[in-house]
Every structure is written in structure tokens, then in C-alpha cells.
Amino acid sequence: MGNFEKFQDLLEKLFQFEASDLDFGIYRILNYKRSKIETFIREDLKNRVEAAFSKHKTERQEAINQSFEVIRQKVAQTLGDQALTPSGDLRKEFENTPLGKEFLEIKARKDEAQAIDEIQSQVFNDLYNFFSRYYEDGDFVPQYRYSIKGHKYAIPYNGEEVKLYWANYEQYYTKTGLLFRDYTFKADSIKAIFRVVSAREEVGSKKATKERFFVLDDENPVEIGQDNCIIIRFQYRELNEEEVKAYQVEGGSNTSKQEKINQKSFDRVLEEIKNTQIKALLMKTYKNDKPLLLYQLNRFSSKNTRDYFIHKNLKKFLSEQLDYFIKSEVLSIETLEKEKFLDKHITRAKVVKEIGEDIIDFLSQIEDFQKRLWEKKKFVIDTEYVISLDKIKDYAGEDFLKEVISHILKAQGQLKEWEELGFGKVEKEDDLILKRDLTGIEYKKLPVDTKYFSQEFKEKLLEKITENNDLDVILDGLLIKSENWQALDLILEKYKEKIQTIYIDPPFNKEQDADYLYNVKYKDSTWASILENRLRLAKGVLSNRGSIFVRCDYNGNWIVRPLMDEIFGRENFRNEIVVKRGAPKAGLFLQFENLKSIGVMYDNLYWFSKHVDRVIGMFIQALPETRKGYWTSFKKIYDRPTLRYEILGINLTKGQWMWNKERTYQAVENYQKYLEISPKTGETLEEYWERTGRKLDFVRRHMDTIQYWVPRKEETLLDNNWLDIPGYSQGWDFKTENSEILLKRVIESTSNEGDLVMDFFLGSGTATAVAQKLGRKWIGVEMGEHFFRFETDNGPSGILVRMKEVLSGKGNHEPCGISKDVNWQGGGFFKYQVVEQYEDTLDNIELKESVQAKIKFGDDYLLKYFLDFETRESPYLLNIEYLKNPFAYKLKVNLEEVGEPQETIVDVPETFNYLLGLKIKKIKTRDNHRKYLFILGEKDGKDIAVLWRPYEDTWSDDDLKRDKEFIIDELETWAPHIVYVNGQSVLTPKLGQHPAEIRYIEPEFKK
């Protein structure tokens, strides 16, 4: 294979030609342009190189010809015309003269310039050497290099004393889907599920690959259940030597190896299925002339193993690397010393730079497009509210609550959920009442979820409870189902510097059972990127007096500390706290049987503050009640004459008493009273002290000494050893469930009631549950399906289930944790939302070729501009045309993270609220021949009204006038400073009695 063909082959790998079967994400776009990319690689690239050479060759020849003409005339003038032959050559007798030598050198350069085409092959080899250094086992891995010899690396360094750097530095980790979620597809009457199960390792088995692959489960690969539901089970693991031979995967990329394994798995599954009808459906030809099952197998394995990272500035990185490569490899010292004619290597360097920059433009266009999709503020897909009955009464009155109850008794979904969560069966209004007395009716604190009711019900509920209350003030918390980077990015404007305490327990970077997808070579690097990306955003929402806690174990503490030093500042490190882990799972015999190291009984909790001089936090430890008060000497060694006086017949000549005379005599009297009362009550001094309010001092004479009583201490200041409390618990059937006692200590010590607490790796929901019980506001973010609900032997569980039980104060699990300790009785109000994900954004790309742009940019259109122009009308970027009805804006969304995405109406108003950073006060909905939604909020001390309604381009002047008058009437009582309105409008700053600035929503949205 020649150098050009070798470079072509590399480019096909870089542009994912092997992914031509894939129809999701960026692959769909590359496949859309597959023919044009192929034409560029197969034809245009060589033409570009030849054109570049031709240009530089002509420039070089003209320069050399000019130099040759100058030296020829100089020879003729100095040595005479006889020095040159009629053909223009130098006669032999003049060759050793200084001028003759110069003539011969320039003539040789002139002759050599005619043969410059021979270095074209060398240029392709240079380009191959440059780009191949970033292509590794099927992945594009941009890492700083300073030589191809010995595969040497370099890192950016600015003279820091210590520098933490990792392979995926300056990149986003983007694998936002669940780790190996069920993959489901349908074919007529059958439903197939690909499910990943834990691999069972044989003792002493020898791994032949470091890479992991999807292989069929050894024990139960295929199961056909009811209704023709097929479950196909896979393991994700390394291969042993026998498997490498069986699958015939000794060489090739990881992608090609997985495809070979998929082919074998396809054959095996068909062998296992005896039902001919099902087999026929799975074998029918599908996309790209592949059988349906094989196509889905390739799609499943690709979705779970591709697209880990996006570089934050690929063009800058590769351009800098290309410049260095040219200087160090193309124009190296060895080349400059060895070559007689440097002109051709300068031409070679220019062509390498020119063509290299073309390839970089193409690669960075794709990378920057993905970066733009990743960084785009995501849409809120759905918004619901959960509010307990008592809060409806508090905020909207008992009459409205009775109206709500009439709807509740008809909402079968709500009634069923209450029964399943252990709240009891509700059939009539009396079942909702806790007690009646002369003061009125006290209702049970049952949580009402608006998802079980109509949109009209939700709108009326929000309007009624915000008539006399500000919504964000009375909301206790916010749950967001989303990958956490996207959630943090979305809410950043609203919650900037508002969070008092952040606690996270991110997935640990363990070995085979890591909680995230990673390239085997870059497990720790992947974990570092996950944390770095998210911690940088978290710093933006942390208040200036706030604290952040990150829990990890020995697998990651060596990464967490320097990473947090870099992001939050070394001066803001407060402490490293040790937290108890769960009990060892193995028995004592097994621990000693294969003992390789001593057991690890604690995790690390890293505590940082936003600013060193503004942190609040005092950690208190409760002392055991078994510790009693005691008597001790009242005399002190210090010598203050004013504290020497007679007590019960004893005086001092030196030294001093502890207290002044007034306090001491009162303490003597207090003890005398106790001695008088105790024979009647039978109380100990400890009990008497408790009953009288724990404020009394006691002093007595004991033989020839004076003593005072030291009451038992209930609390003491903590150090960084927190092994006195559990670190994990198992109350909600969640593997890594943090204990409520641990979170109570963290939250109570670093925040006050009403402060905001956040956990963006929410897990089982402990942080939000504890925050609610302690009277804090809270935000929780989690992307897993357990956000909603999952079934256990103890009844339904999940974050949403847990928070509903917390609001109720009881259920299948509650009261639990700290509920009894803080006397938690329930009640509350929170919002939960589902947010668009990066994968959803990719699904909503619509390409529309731009003829004008192609004409304008010519050959550069494909390399630099096609993605920008051809996707600008996609729904993910906000299509203004679709926004004419803001209540019907649709995106393709996969809410259940399985199967194909479905068109879903998204919550445009809530999305815009986040973009503005609006603190919501009031919400009301009106009908004036169309739906009008009015939102009143506040930002930077100004009241802002946001108005949404459908509109048409065909509105007449009368329509616009009526629209204006209606809006003015509805906004009169709010008197906002700024009004945002969507679509057409004739609103003016003279807004009734209260002038206001009028702004349009669409330009703000497009930012």
C-alpha cells in the first residue's frame, strides 16, 4: 500500500466509514454526507495536493529562475562571455572559481525544481504520521505529542508546583445514557430486549484481551417469555484465549472485532430460537440489507461503546500540534543538515500545512458541532408538581382544597399510587382526614402529583397557590431527571451563587464494575473528566459562603483532592473527613483465604469552601447518654484575690475559686433546694437538673473541700473522624444509599433553615430527603430510571417515591432515617422535571442543504460550513416557525431511554424561565379565543412578566389591537418593569398605568 492509499485508509477511519450502518447521533450526519466525504478523500484530496504542489512549484521555479538569471549575467560580466557555452552551461575551467561554484549550485537547484513531484509521496507519509498519532484502536484520542519517535508525549504546563493532568484533559465526557440500559426493539408481534448481566469470572481464567466486548451470556443467553417477548442476555467483559480464536478476532479494530462477535451471536440466537415465525421476523431484511436482528445487535453495541468525549477546542489543539510537527519532524535538524536542497522541503512543509489544515477544518467542524450540541441549553421536556394536602390548604385555602379533593377522588392513578406507597386506601373524603376538632379539620399530608391530573387542573392549582404566595418561595425543592452536566448548565443562570451546601457521592472509578462507560485504557482519565466537567459548573452555583463535599474511596481520592484544589483553590480546602463504609461482605474465612491487603473500612469526604474567609460550619457530635454529671474541685490554681471568699465555712489564703461570689452563693442555694426536694421526689441530681431546664449551677461542701457539679455534656466539637455514625444504609433498597444521619451532620452544620442544598449525583435521594426534614430548600439531579420508581420486596422505591413518602411522613419505608430524631411530621411542595439530553438533541437534527452557501463558499463548504448551514433550522436549536404555538413545540425524545424516540411536546415556558434566570412569583392562565400564559418573576430587583400565546402571521390590525388590550388588562395588577412576549405584538412601553420595557422572546431564546 502506497503512502497516499495508507493516508486515505486512515481518513476513512477518522471519518467513521466503518460506522456506515449506524443511524443515530453524529453518525447519521456523516452517513448523510458519506458520498461527498468519500469523494473528498478519494478524488478531491489528491487534486488539492497536486494543486498545492503546482502553486508552490511555480513560485519556487520563478524564484530560482530569477536567481539563475542574475548569476548568469554576473558570470558573463565578471568572467566574460567565454565562461559560458552556447547552451548556457559553465565551461569546466571555471567550475572551481567562487562565482562558478555559486553558478553550479543555483543551476542544480533549478534542475532539481523540475523533479519536485517526487516528494508528493513523502507529503502523504507526513500527513499519515501526523494524524495517525491521534488514532488509537478505533478511537480518536487527541493528546499532546512532541515526537513520533518513541511515542513521546507532552502536557501543557504553566510552571505550577504540582500539575494534575490526564489523557482526556480539556474534553467533555458525553456518555449520558444509562450504563447498559435495556435496549428494546419491536418487529410486528414480537418485542426483543437486549439486557446486559454481570459477568461470571472463572477462577484462574486468563484474559487474552484488555478490551471488553459484548458477548452472549454463558448460562441463559435467550429467553422467550409471554406475548412473544424475547430477552437476549449479554455480558460485557474481556475475552479469554479460546474465545479470541472462536470469534476470530486476533486482529483489527475494536469495532471490527465486535462486529465479528455480533455475527457469531446472531447465529447463536437463531439456533436457540425454535419458533419459525419469530425466527423469520428476526431474519427479515432491514436497513443496509442486513437482517433485522444483526442490524440491531450492531446498533446496540455501538450505542454503548461510542462517543465518550468531545474536545473543547480541537482546531486550536490540532493546529498547534501540526505547527510543532512540521518544525520538529518535516523540517527537523536532521533534514536540514542532511539535505543539499532545502527548497523542496520548505515546499513539502507548506503543502503538509495546507492539506493538514484542510483535514483539521473538517475534523474540527464535526467536533465543534457536537460541542455546540452538548453546550446548548437543553429544553425542559416535562414539568410536574407534588404538593401535600395540608400545603394546598395553607396556600390556597380550605374551599379550594375541597375542590381539589373532588378531583382526587376521581383520579384513579393517584389513588392507586397512594395505596401502593403504603398511605392507605382512599375511597371518600373522610379517608383524607386525620382528625376533626373545634379548631377545624386536619387533613392527612398525602402528596398530590399533578401528573395524574389534567393540564387545566395543574394550571388552576398553580394560579390559586400563587395568588398570595410567590411560587419559588413556597417550593421546598426541585428534582431534575437529567444527566447532571446538562442540568447544571440549564439552571446555572437561575441559581448562580445561590447554593449553600453541595454534597455529592459520584460513581467510584472501580475496576470491572465501574458505574460509567470508559475506554479500558482510560478508566481513571474518564472519571477525572466526569468530575472536572461537573465540578466547574457546580462552582458557579455555590454561594460565596457555601461548602461542597465530595465522597470517594481509595480508588479515586488521589484524583479528587488535586482536582478540587485546582477548581476551588487549595486555600479553600477545609478538611478530609473519614466516613464509615458498609460492613465487609465476605466472611472472616474468605477474607483471610485470599488476603492481598488489609480491609478498607472508610471512605473519604473532601470538604471545600467557596471562599476561605466566608465559610460557615461547626460540626457537633452527640455524646452518649450513659455519660453522667460529676463533682470536682471548685478551687483553681490561679491567684486572684477578688475570687477568694468564704464558702460554707471554708476560706482561701492563696489560689482562687472558679466563679464570682454572687454566682457561687446562688449555686450553694440551688443545691440546698435540691436536698430539700429530693427526699420527696426521689430525683437524682441529674434528673432535677433536667427538669429545671438545665440552667442551674450546684456547689457543695464535701469534707474539707468545696466542689461544683459538672453536668454531662450532650455534644462536643467533632474532628475529621466520623466513624461514629453509619456512612451507608439500606432503607430504600439502593446499593450505595448514603445514610440520613451522615447527611444530617453535613447539612445541619453548614447551612441554616431555608438555605439551598444540592446533590447532582442524587442516587437514592438521601440528600433531598434529609434537606426536606431539616427545613432546607433543595435541588436533586439524577439520570437513572430509578428517578421515578422501581419495585422491591419492600414495595415501590425510587427518588420520586421516596420524596412522596417524606412529604406524607409515612409509607412503606417512612418514618426512617432521622425522621424520629427531628420529629418529622411530613408536608411539603416540590417540582420535578425531565430535561432534554444530548442524545435527544442528536435525534432532532434535521439537515437541509443550503445551495446559496455552497455557491458562496465553494470548495470550503464541505470542510468548514455544511453543518452550520444545513442544521440551522433543526428543532433542537429552536425553530421560530414552530414557536408560533409555544404549547405545541415538539421534539423527538426517548423518555424511557429504550426503543425509538417519540415526538413529545416540550415545556417551552419553563425552558425560557431558566434561560432568563427568573425567580418565579405568579402564574396564571387565561382564555381569550386562545390560551394565554402569564408568568411573573423577578431578576436583579426587577419584576419581569413573560407572556406566551399562539399567534398567526395572518393577524389583522384589529387582532393585534385586541391582543394588546387583553394583555394590558391582565398585567395591570402586576405592574412589571419588563415584559417579554412571543411572536407578533403591538405592545408599547406605555403599558396601562405602569410603563414597562417590551422585549421579544425569540431573540433571547436564540442566544
Segments from the language model and where they lie:
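Conserved SAM-binding loop and adjacent beta-strand
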Residues: 730-742
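Short glycine/proline-rich turn/loop motifs
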Residues: 464-476, 514-519, 722-732
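Glycine-rich, acidic and aromatic/proline-enriched surface loops and short helix-turn segments
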Residues: 504-509, 715-727, 748, 763
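Mobile active-site "lid"/loop adjacent to the S-adenosyl-L-methionine
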Residues: 500, 507-530, 534, 543-545, ...
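Conserved beta-strand signature within the Rossmann-like core of class I S-adenosyl-L-methionine
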Residues: 546-550
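Conserved proline-anchored active-site loop of SAM-dependent methyltransferases
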Residues: 234, 497-513, 564, 757-771, ...
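Accessory, often C-terminal, charged low-complexity segments
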Residues: 1-459, 465, 471, 485, ...
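Short acidic, Gly/Ser-rich segments with clustered Asp/Glu that frequently serve as metal-coordination loops
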Residues: 484-487, 509
